[in-house]
Amino acid sequence: DRICTGITSSNSPHVVKTATQGEVNVTGVIPLTTTPTKSHFANLKGTKTRGKLCPKCLNCTDLDVALGRPKCMGTIPSAKASILHEVKPVTSGCFPIMHDRTKIRQLPNLLRGYENIRLSTHNVINAETAPGGPYIVGTSGSCPNVTNGNGFFATMAWAVPKNNNNKTATNPLTVEVPFICTEGEDQITVWGFHSDDETQMVKLYGDSKPQKFTSSANGVTTHYVSQIGGFPNQAEDGGLPQSGRIVVDHMVQKSGKTGTITYQRGILLPQKVSCPSGRSKVIKGSFPLIGEADCLHEKYGALNKSKPYYTGAHAKAIGNCPIWVKTPLKLANGTKYRPPAKLLKER
């Protein structure tokens, strides 16, 4: 980084720091850094950028879409980059969900990390003939479908014993969850269970005791015990007040791997599954996405790379981004500065 002395001078010298000569006055510099200002977010240049999981699903949260809530069914566009836009807590409506008993709030962000996401065309399990049945598939007036009839989530079947003969207590039952996605895709299987007060538990299932549930897939095993009663009536989106609650969870199955669910009464059996593939970079941001940008930065929003480095807030960024540095960098493009009087004396 040696800088030589020139024979001409400048009235406005600049100071650069060098590794071998320390601070040096020079006749000219090129700034290498910029300090961004906060902006809106944008689509990332050269890639598809996804905001909401289902842009055409109006009045739906991303968790609604991930669970297949009626009226929230639609195509999830492919994307190499995804915006994590929802303010916590992430919730879904329809039937009252005990969101904090499981990791279900993480499901939308798990899906965002995939480039391609599709819902299976058929159910992974025949719920009506599953162990412990025969069952009827329950629906709720709190979960209206597209014709405003009673409905439920597309990813789960509410397995209610069909007749009095099997509305009885049962020992734990096990059902295998096959892998039905195609090679190269993962399978994200949603399941859960319903519980209510003692009176409703006896009416629906013939057993008022807490029920046990276990899921196992990809080396991960999770255990739950249902809570009986103690729930205040809760209505979702203008639906009927519900004395019961559902607990919803998900498991990730890798290609060709079978999962298992062990359950008692009140099971919400898996139905449609998500089949995601590829990878999408995820960054926290906000809507709307306006125009295009070289880089998306969690603190500054959309950035266009005018300089190779930037100063200011250091945060996650994706795309063709400048590199963060603590202090401004300059490139000397002139000679070492000497005052005019000293130059004349040396001559």
Curated annotation (Swiss-Prot):
Record-level GO cellular component terms: host cell plasma membrane; membrane; viral envelope; virion membrane
Gene expressing this chain: HA
From the UniProt record, give one GO term of the biological process aspect: symbiont entry into host cell
Q: What does this protein do?
A: Binds to sialic acid-containing receptors on the cell surface, bringing about the attachment of the virus particle to the cell. Plays a major role in the determination of host range restriction and virulence. Class I viral fusion protein. Responsible for penetration of the virus into the cell cytoplasm by mediating the fusion of the membrane of the endocytosed virus particle with the endosomal membrane. Low pH in endosomes induce an irreversible conformational change in HA2, releasing the fusion hydrophobic peptide. Several trimers are required to form a competent fusion pore.
* InterPro entries referenced in this protein's UniProt entry, alphabetically: Capsid_hemagglutn (IPR008980), Hemagglutn_HA1_a/b_dom_sf (IPR013828), Hemagglutn_influenz_A/B (IPR001364)
> Pfam families of this UniProt entry?
Hemagglutinin
Describe its assembly.
Homotrimer of disulfide-linked HA1-HA2.
This chain's protein is named Hemagglutinin
